[in-house]
């Protein structure tokens, strides 16, 4: 998980992304395998879940500042956008940390972009965390929502629904692990009886 002094990039398994997309079409697709969409881990659990915020390098689109954090290099050139509205809860087993040095060795241009994004995030994680917490709170508010909250609910993933799906996925995965352990134990038992 990320800490304030060391933000980390992760990839999320396509299988898990596709699973969430069945429940909420606002969950962004993963990209190709060469440059799978990077996510930034949020500093602390939200409602008991580890949330990850997708990062895009697209600069040809205007992003609403209420639900995104724009990243800039030292020359004030936009180098990416965190899409807070599309953040998702992810089980630990479904995310993998990205090694920026490996990315740089494989694709220097992409690796250097990620390094610039990392440096920006390192200086601005408090701002990112505050935005994430505010958006989450506004989207999950109970009672009659304000105009802003209605807007946010319309452009953000359905966080409560995704949390349910995340929990179901974890439970399904645990059941698979138990079944696998039972099969292995059974096979060992059968081997001893021969």
UniProtKB/Swiss-Prot annotation:
Biological process annotations from GO: plasmid maintenance
Organism this protein belongs to: Bacillus thuringiensis subsp. kurstaki
Keyword annotations: Coiled coil, Endonuclease, Hydrolase, Nuclease, Plasmid, RNA-binding, Toxin-antitoxin system
Listed EC numbers: 3.1.-.-
Enzymatic class: hydrolase
InterPro entries reported for this sequence: ToxN/AbiQ_toxin, Type_III_TA_endoRNase
Effect of residue 58 to A: Overexpression no longer inhibits growth in E.coli
Family from the record: Belongs to the ToxN/AbiQ toxin family.
Bias type Basic and acidic residues, positions: 171-182
Consequence of substituting residue 148 to A: Overexpression no longer inhibits growth in E.coli
Assembly and interaction partners: One ToxN monomer binds to a 34-nt-long single repeat of the ToxI RNA; this complex forms a triangular heterohexameric complex with ToxN connected by the ToxI RNA to another toxin molecule. The ToxI repeats are cleavage products of their precursor. The ToxI repeat forms a pseudoknot which occludes the toxin active site.
Task performed by this protein: Toxic component of a type III toxin-antitoxin (TA) system. An endoribonuclease which cleaves between the first and second A of AAAAA sequences; it tolerates other nucleotides in positions +2 and +4 of the consensus. Digests cognate antitoxin RNA ToxI as shown by the 2'-3'-cyclic phosphate at the 3' end of the 34-nt repeats and probably other RNAs. Inhibits growth when expressed in E.coli without causing cell lysis; this bacteriostatic effect is neutralized by cognate RNA antitoxin ToxI, which has 2.9 nearly identical 34 nucleotide-long repeats.
Pfam families: ToxN_toxin
Protein name listed in UniProt: Endoribonuclease ToxN
């Amino acid at each position: 998980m990320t800490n304030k002094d060391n933000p980390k990039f992760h990839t999320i398994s396509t299988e898990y992304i596709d699973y969430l997309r069945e429940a909420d079409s606002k969950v962004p697709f993963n990209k190709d395998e060469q440059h799978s969409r990077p996510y930034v881990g949020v500093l602390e659990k939200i409602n008991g879940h580890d949330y990850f915020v997708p990062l895009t390098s697209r600069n040809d689109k205007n992003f609403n500042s209420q639900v995104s954090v724009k990243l800039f290099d030292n020359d004030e050139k936009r180098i990416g956008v965190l899409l807070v509205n599309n953040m998702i809860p992810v089980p630990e087993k479904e995310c993998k940390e990205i090694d920026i040095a490996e990315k740089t060795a494989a694709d220097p241009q992409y690796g250097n972009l990620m390094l610039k994004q990392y440096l920006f995030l390192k200086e601005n994680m408090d701002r990112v965390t505050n935005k994430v917490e505010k958006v989450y709170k506004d989207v999950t508010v109970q009672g009659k929502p304000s105009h802003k909250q209605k807007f946010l609910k319309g452009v953000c993933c359905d966080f409560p629904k995704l949390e349910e799906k995340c929990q179901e996925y974890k439970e399904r995965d645990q059941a698979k692990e138990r079944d696998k352990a039972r099969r292995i134990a059974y096979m060992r038992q059968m081997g001893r009886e021969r």
